[in-house]
Amino acid sequence: MPKLLLLILFALLPLSQLNAAEWSSQIGIEARHFFDNALSPQQHGDNLSLTFESEFYHDWDDGQQRIVFTPFARIDQHDSERSHADLRELYWRQTFNNTDLYVGVRKLFWGVTESLHLVDIINQSDTVENLDGEDKLGQPMISFFHSSVVGDWEFFLMPWFRERTFPGIEGRLRPPFVVDQDNAQYESGDAEKHIDSALRWSHVIDDWDVGLSWFHGTDRTPQLVTQTINGAVMLLPYYAQLDQLGVDAQYTYESWLWKLEFVSRRHDNRFSPDLNRSSATVGGFEYTWYGLFSSATDIGLVMEYQYDSRDGNRAPIANNDIAIGSRLTLNDVQDSTLLALVASDLDQRERFISLEGSRRLGEEMSISLEARFFSNTAPQTQLFWLRSDDYLELLLTHYF
Amino acid sequence: MINKKHYALLITLVAMLIPNTVFSMEDEALVKRGLEIAIEADRRDNGFGDSSSSLEMILRNRHGEQSERQLRNKTLEMKDDGDKAIIIFDTPRDVKGTAFLSFTHKLDADDQWLYLPALKRVKRIASRNKAGPFMGSEFAYEDISSQEVEKYSYLYIKDDTFAERDHFIIDRDPVDPKSGYKRQRVWLDKAEYRIWKIDFYDRKDTLLKTLTYDDYNQYLGQYWRANVMDMVNHQTGKSTRLNWRDFSFRNGYSEKEFTKGALKKAR
C-alpha cells in the first residue's frame, strides 16, 4: 500500500503546480503517557508516534469534475499494528445537474449524536488511531448523490470490505488476547469481496434535520472469537452479514439541540442463531449558555442515554449507559475548546471518562490534549480489559 | 373624593406629561424619518441577485499582535426572506475546508450549519449565539448576518457632514432581545445611502465598538460595496479589519448551491 501511495503522490505532483492551495498537509507528533504498568509484559509504557496526512484536490470542467486524494500514515514507537498507512480518500466526482457520481475511496459521516455513533456505518473504524471510533478507514465505492425538493438521496455500492484495525501484541488499549488480523473469518463466502449496498435519505424540514438509512452487507463491527492456535490463545475477528435500518434526527430550538439515533439490526449469526435481531438507541440533548459572565465564552451541557438490546457477552460497552458532558468554547483567536464527558453504565457502574482540549498555536500549529480514564472496572464489567490503560495524550500538529 | 392635595399632585403629573406628549409627536416624526432612510438604503441594495467575494480578516489585540484569516463567501438574495450564505475558511490552516451555511431570516432565528472536514460531518448549530464573536474576531454573528429592515426600530437623529460628505445619522435598536446591543448609531451618506460608520452600544448603553467603512466601489451600476471594514472594540482595545476582494455579482447561483448537501462539497 505505501508504495502505491507514493506512486500516486508523484503522479499528482505536476498538477500541484497549477494551484498550490489545492494541497494541504499536516504532520503530528503524539506522546501518550500511561498512568499504570501494562497488564502484559509484552506491552510498553509511554509511547511516541508520528503521523502524516496530506490532501490534494483538483476541480475542472467548470467545477463539474473533481478528484480528491488523501493519504495517511502513522509510525508508532512500539505497536507495529498502529504503524500503518491508509488511503483515506481517492475519488473522482462528476456532477450532472442535480446528481453527483462518485467513483473511488471515500470517507463520510452519518448521524447527529456526540457520545456514540450508531447510524454511521459506511466507513470502518480505524481503532488503532483512537478508541472513540471517529477515525475511519477509506471505503472503496461507487456512489450517487441526488438532491431533490423532497430531500437528498444517496446510494452506495461497496465492492471491497475494510477490516477493523486492532492494536498489536506490543500495543496498549487492547484485549488481554491479541486479535489475529491475518485470519479474519467471514460469514459470506465472498469474504471481503462481498458487495455491500446502502441507501440514505436525508432532509431538512424547518427546525428538523432527519435521515433514514438502509445498509445491507458485512457488519463493520466483528465478533471476537477465542481460539487456540499452536497453544496460544488468540481472538479471531468474525464478520457477520447485517441488515440495518437507521434513523437519525435533530431538533434545533434556540439554545437546545435534541438528538436521536436509532438502529434496528438483523444479523445472520452463526454462533447464536437465537440472537439475530437487535436494536440500539442513543438520544439526548445539548444545551448551550452563550457569552458566560459577559465574556465570549460559551458553555454547553451534553446529556445522552445509550441503549442496546443485546445482553450477556454480546452486549457492547454502551448498552445501558448515560453520558454527561460539558463543552467549553472560549471563542478566542486561538479557537480554544475543552470537552469533558463521563459515560456511566447504569447496571455495572463502570465509568469511562474522557477529556479533550485543543488550541491553535500561531497560524500553522495546534496543540491538543486528550485524557481517558476507565474506572470502577470490576472483573465482570466490559471495561475490565482496559483497567490499566488510563492515559494522557499530547498532540502537536503542524499544518502546511 | 379628590382633595386639594390630590388635585395638586394631579396638576403636577399633567404638567409633567405635557412636554412629553409634545416630544412624543416629534418623536413619531423622527421614527418615521429614520425608517424611511433605512427603507431607502435597503431599496437601493435590492435586486443584486447573488454575489461572491474573498475576505481577509486581520485580528489585532491591544499589544498589536496580529492574526490573519482568509475566507471566501457566496451570498444568494432571497425574496421576502433573509439572504442565504456560505462561508468557506481557507486559513488558519487547521480549520481549512471548514464551511458555514446560514439561512438568515428577517425576524426568526437564523438556520446555521457547520461542515467539519476532518470528520466529514455537517452539524446543525444553534443560532442563538448572535451576540457571540465570529471566528474570534470583533465581529459578532449578528454583524455579519444579512441586514434586514425588520431587524431594528429606527430613529432619525440629525444631519452631519464629515469627509466632505453629507450624512444622515440614525439610531437603530435591535428588535431581538438576544442581540448584544442596546442600539447602533449609523452614519449614511445622503447621496448614495452608503453606511460609513456604526457605533455599537452594549446592553448597558455604553459605547462598545465602532465600525468604519472605506474604499467603496460600485457594481452593476448600482450596488456599493466597501473594500475595507474596520471594527474597533473600545472596551478591550482589540480590533478586526476586513479586506474584501474579488466581488462578483449575478453568478447564476441557485438555492441548490446553498443546502446541507452542497455544504459538504464547498471548496
Task: Name each region found by the language model.
Chain B
Residues M1-I11:
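Bacterial N-terminal signal peptides that target proteins for export
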Residues V22-E26:
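Boundary at the C-terminal end of the N-terminal hydrophobic targeting segment
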Residues G34-A118:
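N-terminal mature ectodomain segment of secretory-pathway/periplasmic proteins
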Residues L35-E36, S67, I144-Y156, D205-T210:
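A short, amphipathic edge element
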Residues N73-E77, L155-T161, D215-Y216:
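Short amphipathic beta-strand and strand-loop transition segments with alternating hydrophobic
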Residues D90, L101-F103, D111-Y115, R121-I125, ...:
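Gly/Pro-enriched, hydrophobic low-complexity segments
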Residues A266-R267:
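Short, solvent-exposed mixed-charge patches
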